[in-house]
Structures are given as structure tokens and as C-alpha cells.
Swiss-Prot record:
It comes from the Eukaryota. Unknown, but synaptobrevins are presumed to be involved in targeting and fusion of synaptic vesicles with the presynaptic membrane as well as in neurotransmitter release. Residues 1-81 are cytoplasmic. Residues 122-131 have a biased composition (Polar residues). It is found in: Cytoplasmic vesicle, Secretory vesicle, Synaptic vesicle membrane; Synapse, Synaptosome. Belongs to the synaptobrevin family. Keywords: Coiled coil, Cytoplasmic vesicle, Membrane, Synapse, Synaptosome, Transmembrane, Transmembrane helix. This is Synaptobrevin-like protein. Residues 18-78 form the v-SNARE coiled-coil homology domain. It is a single-pass type IV membrane protein.
Length: 131
């Protein structure tokens, strides 16, 4: 027997082949979409971790800023105290210098008066002896 194939007999084969190609394309797209969804989930996880680290860094930065401000004020006061002590020392040094200079002047005046008194005494005794 002779079997004659017509166009209608070949149509199911072509349709079946097209269906298989379409199914293969759908499977490929599904695989790509699964990979993309996995990547999106991984990125979301990474972003969540990064967000947590950013929050921790922000909290640490705020704490650092507060402690840096306290430290700045502490050293500012230390600097003020040091300048006050230095100022007092300079004033004391100036007072000591003034007292020393005044006492030196006083000593010179006293020595000058003492020596002029001796000179007057010597002259008067010399004058008395001549008469």
C-alpha cells in the first residue's frame, strides 16, 4: 500500500515543531527571569545589609561628633586655664621686677644721701680744724 502524504498530514508536524521551539523559548525566558529574580533578591539582601551598616555608621558618626564637641570644649577650658595661669605668672614677674627696680633706686638714693652726708661731715670737720 501506498501511503500518500498531503499538506494536511505535514501540518501537525510543523505545528508540533513550532510548538517545541516556542516552548524552548519560553523555557529560556523563564530561566532568564529566574536568574534575574535571584539577582534582584541578592541585591535587595545586599542593599538591606548596606542600609544597616549605613545606619550604624550614622549612629557612630553622631556619637563621634558629640564626643568631639565635648573634647573640644574640655581642651578650650584647659587652654583658658593655662592662659590664666600664664597671665598670673607674668603679672607676678612684673611685680617682682618693679619691686626690685624700686628697691635698687631706693638703695642708690640712700647710698647717695649717706655718702653726701659723710662728705658734708668731712668738709665741716675739715673746716673746723682749719679755724
Amino acid at each position: 500500500m501506498l501511503h500518500i502524504t498531503t499538506m494536511t498530514d505535514k501540518a501537525p508536524i510543523k505545528t508540533n515543531k513550532r510548538l517545541q521551539q516556542t516552548q524552548a523559548q519560553v523555557n529560556e525566558v523563564v530561566d532568564i527571569m529566574r536568574v534575574n529574580v535571584d539577582k534582584v533578591l541578592e541585591r535587595d539582601k545586599n542593599l538591606s545589609e548596606l542600609d544597616g551598616r549605613a545606619d550604624a555608621l550614622q549612629a557612630g558618626a553622631s556619637q563621634f561628633e558629640a564626643s568631639a564637641g565635648k573634647l573640644k570644649r574640655k581642651f578650650w577650658w584647659k587652654n583658658c586655664k593655662m592662659l590664666a595661669v600664664l597671665g598670673v605668672l607674668v603679672v607676678i614677674l612684673i611685680i617682682v621686677l618693679i619691686v626690685w627696680v624700686v628697691s635698687e633706686q631706693k638703695n642708690k638714693v640712700e647710698q647717695s644721701e649717706h655718702s653726701s652726708h659723710h662728705l658734708v661731715m668731712d668738709n665741716s670737720s675739715h673746716l673746723l680744724s682749719e679755724q
